[in-house]
Amino acid sequence: MNPRTSIRVHEAKKGESNMKQTAMLTTASLLTILLMTIHMTGDILFKMAPAGLINLLVIFIFVVQLYGTLLLAGRRAGYIIIFFGSAIGLLISVIHMKGTRGVLGGDIGTSGQAFLFVWTLLALGITATFSIILSARALLSLPWRRSRRASTAA
């Protein structure tokens, strides 16, 4: 086998892997956003979060994460936004798993919707953690500085 051909095949496989990771991260981040919105709906319905204008801030946070996921996919800024947005999603799960206002706090424990609420928290924790891992891997694999040759050649 020609050494040049094997290098090209290896580079193509590496590029395919990078595209698969980007697709996985995009999918996991979109699922995290979806589960966070479902969760926020439950929080409002179960009176664990206030209904009102404060939710405009929540909408803004979701829009920023959506922007980072879709429009900044594969870029450092997108990975950073996804990392912190997913950390918020994981934090939501952790907060609800502990304390007096946790999973069975408020009106949730006596509701027929308790299963969906708890399932959403578990799924949110899974997708958020997966998004954190993938975005951290992507950030660590990027070069942090451009070489002077690359910037002066342009």
Regions found by a protein language model. Give the residues of each.
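Cytosolic juxtamembrane helix and N-cap/initiation of the first transmembrane helix
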Residues: 7-32, 137-140
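Loop-to-helix transition at the N-terminal end of transmembrane alpha-helices
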Residues: 48-63
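Alpha-helical transmembrane segments in multipass membrane proteins, preferentially the mid-helix core
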Residues: 62-72, 134-135
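A cytosolic-side transmembrane-helix exit/cap motif
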Residues: 72-75, 98-111
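C-terminal TM-helix exit segments that contain a strictly Trp-centered aromatic cap at the helix terminus
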Residues: 36-46, 87-103
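Cytosolic juxtamembrane helix at the C-terminal end of the final transmembrane segment
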Residues: 133-153
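Loop-to-transmembrane helix junctions at the membrane interface
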Residues: 69-94
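Individual transmembrane alpha-helices with interfacial aromatic-anchor signatures
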Residues: 110-128
